[in-house]
């Protein structure tokens, strides 16, 4: 139980510090106090900037936030999940060809049109969304409510 409480607390604090209040989504890299001061040119070799939105981070955050909401019943966690899910659907998902873009600019526009590559395959996004759908199905089965939280 102690580890579970720590994990759920970490999810909440991490989301609160990394959520981009100006444009939405999760920022790629921040310092441990939630600022960008030390990461202006972070990971230049991989061509990722601190303020970009990376598919993997968003997908894992969706799973973590929904798991936290499910385990705690915390309405704030439900709202954080819903906010991030709707943002991802609007910005990452390509309605014409499916799948998510790999990297977005800070404002949510696609930085590149790629949807696959060395590190991004057609596994993580379906797995994350499937995991979320399982939690949501469980919630609906237990409560009969498909509108209140999500």
Name these PLM-found stretches:
Residues 1-150:
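Glycan-recognition and catalytic cores of secretory/periplasmic carbohydrate-active enzymes
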